Amino acid sequence: SVFVQQQGTFCDFSGGDSWVILSPIEQSIKRKIEAVGTPLKDWDINIYRGVLTGCNEAFIISTEKRNEILANCKTEDERKRTEELIRPILRGRDIKRYGYEWAELWLINTHNGVKGRIPRIRIEDYPAVKAHLDQFWDKIKDRADQGDTPYNLRNCAYLEDFSKPKIVYMEIQTDNPNEGYP
């Protein structure tokens, strides 16, 4: 057809590399990048999938809700611990081409710990957070992605990496709305 003749491009599939179908200009750009860059597979990094809560509406909260939880803390010590527990979070859709647009969302990081290194979060030490999560009890009690208790997030072997710098990809492909948060 005329369209194929006008738009067709040659792709060499004889090598052992993955198939990449690009226009001639895109192939040229790819070759230039590969000539000066280090392939991601050769970097000394680990790639993870992010946080799975099993119930985002309970564990991912707005700034307003965070402030409400902090205001409900009974002591200054509880407030300080709670501030450290509730961490800012970026979702895949918050990542833009050259930066990010933070949606002012926070993760209640009631993690399950890392055996032998980091203890599990005991919800009893965070009464204001527990009161918030209790509002979602029917949803959090039976979720598959949970830790030792329904209040804990699932086991995460790379918990220590959450406070390190990251490379974040903006397109997360998932059919499950409770997954895919970097």
Report the location of each language-model feature.
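Polybasic, glycine- and aromatic-enriched phosphate-binding surface used to engage nucleic acids
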Residues: 2-182
